[in-house]
Amino acid sequence: ILTAGAAQRYVNIEGHMVGKRVVILGSGDIGLIMARRMTLEGAKVLACVELMPYSGGLQRNIVQCLNDFDIPLYLSHTIVDIKGKNRVEEVVVAEVGADRKPVPGTEIHFDCDTVLLSVGLIPENELTRTADIKMDPRTNGAVVYENMETSCSGIFACGNVVHVHDLVDFVTAESQRAGKAAAEYVLSGEKD
């Protein structure tokens, strides 16, 4: 049982396959992208299971990551049981009612060895907290000024350190703004 982000790191960076038969809980973009990635790496993604009656991911990712690979998306469903000894062997999924509670008698059993959790992200804030940078309680990320400088003079933040981004396009623009401001800061010779 891994987060989709951890699986992404293992597969993309470390070159380790995390499973052969996979069920993904949550249909956010990272979960959808990992469904495709796991399939391309040779795994069989049995299902993408979403508690809500709609996907949390972009429509293009649903098409390109699930539909194109015949991976079923179970909306208004959740995992109700995970079985196995020493590792995952089976996942039980059930439909949920309007109250988001499992509906008895709707269980589906999946023979699998891996569960990926894609159920919400928080910003990467370990270094932010260590540096005693002011945090935004709404986003759990660093508070930044318009130029992306944090509450600590000379420290700039962008991307998932500030808040979780859905599209890399937004991270690119933000990182360019932060990089330019950091360079201007260094060149100005300002010091506290």
Positions of the model-derived regions?
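Residues forming the flavin
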Residues: I1-D192
